[in-house]
């Protein structure tokens, strides 16, 4: 696996869990596959590169994940504003409950878990830049063209007015500005010793992800105020992140196996949920991808246990 450059690994791995293990995307549509690769791949890579270049920690990553959500679900797919779908808590033309759910899912599944897993596998290169400056700007152009161009083909109707695009651009710019200015972590003087075993970290991450996602599925259907739904969903997500922080999951010197335990715990929620997703979608695609993902994660764990030489 180490023969594959880390940038290429992250590029191709990023869309797998969010779109294919979850069953969110059709499996036999090459155009959607291309759109996903040019969306999730550059998106995760750009965020990871800014983290490395600016010498920031995971706080900057989660701030940039907000910008990613606005780009994908707002500028590209228009789900944040579509008046015909997911309209719970709609106010000022925004589907706020859906927006909250997308912030939770994408920040954890599309951005955090893939980057953390990649940095566990490529531990020796964790502080390095994975792409050259020219490649970085190529990725930015490809990502932008995909969002603004392909998005019009995938979701051409019910688009908001020009003022919404200006607000979205302002939010993305503000997130980039803020991520660049938040304090970075203190340099690791030695490898962080986790407070718990890797198995404990895996089970805790899986349990936290399970609780966060169950809340995300159940709360939107409850007969309560939309504002309360938004608050509950985001609070549970922040509580999960706080739990990970207290257990040193975000420490810069965290060892590769502990990073893997946290990332695989988050990803494994979708593996366990795949039979239900397969039933809901009426095809075996989510289950097949989940089995492949489980096998891949088992292989990665085996290699990491052998040490850097593997």
Residue spans for each PLM region:
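Short aromatic-rich membrane-water interface segments that cap or initiate transmembrane helices
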Residues: 90-105
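N-terminal signal-anchor module of multipass membrane proteins
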Residues: 1-45
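C-terminal ends of transmembrane alpha-helices
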Residues: 18-23, 75-82, 142-159, 211-218
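Membrane helical hairpin/interfacial module
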Residues: 31-81
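Extended, charged low-complexity segments
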Residues: 189-310
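Hydrophobic cores of alpha-helical transmembrane segments in multi-pass inner/ER membrane proteins
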Residues: 37-48, 102-119, 167-183, 232-243, ...
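Short, hydrophobic transmembrane alpha-helix segments
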Residues: 20-30, 155-158, 219-222, 275-283
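Membrane-water interface at loop-to-transmembrane-helix junctions
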Residues: 130-139, 158-167, 187-207
């Amino acid at each position: 696996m180490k023969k594959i450059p880390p940038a290429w690994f992250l590029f191709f791995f990023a869309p797998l869990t969010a779109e294919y293990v979850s069953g969110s995307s059709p499996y036999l549509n090459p155009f959607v596959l291309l759109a996903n690769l040019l969306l999730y791949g550059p998106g995760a890579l750009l965020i990871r590169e800014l983290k490395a270049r600016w010498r920031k920690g995971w706080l900057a990553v989660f701030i940039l994940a907000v910008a990613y959500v606005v780009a994908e679900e707002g500028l590209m797919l228009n789900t944040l504003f579509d008046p015909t779908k997911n309209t719970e808590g709609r106010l000022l033309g925004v589907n706020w409950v859906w927006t909250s759910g997308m912030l939770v899912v994408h920040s954890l599944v599309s951005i955090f878990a893939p980057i953390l897993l990649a940095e566990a596998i490529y531990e020796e290169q964790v502080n390095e830049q994975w792409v050259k400056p020219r490649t970085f700007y190529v990725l930015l152009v490809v990502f932008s063209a995909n969002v603004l161009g392909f998005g019009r083909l995938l979701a051409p109707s019910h688009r908001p007015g020009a003022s919404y695009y200006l607000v979205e651009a302002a939010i993305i710019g503000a997130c980039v500005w803020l991520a660049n200015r938040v304090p970075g972590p203190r340099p690791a003087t030695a490898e962080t010793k986790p407070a718990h075993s890797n198995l404990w970290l895996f089970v805790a991450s899986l349990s936290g992800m399970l609780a966060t996602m169950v809340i995300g599925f159940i709360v939107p259907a409850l007969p309560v105020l939309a504002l309360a739904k938004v608050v509950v969903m985001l609070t549970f997500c922040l509580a999960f992140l706080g739990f990970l922080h207290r257990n040193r999951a975000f420490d810069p010197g965290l060892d590769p196996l502990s990073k893997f335990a946290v990332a695989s715990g988050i990803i494994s929620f979708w593996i366990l949920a795949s039979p239900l997703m397969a039933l809901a979608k009426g095809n075996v695609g989510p289950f097949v991808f989940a089995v492949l993902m489980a096998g891949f994660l088992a292989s990665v764990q085996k290699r990491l246990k052998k040490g850097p030489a593997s």
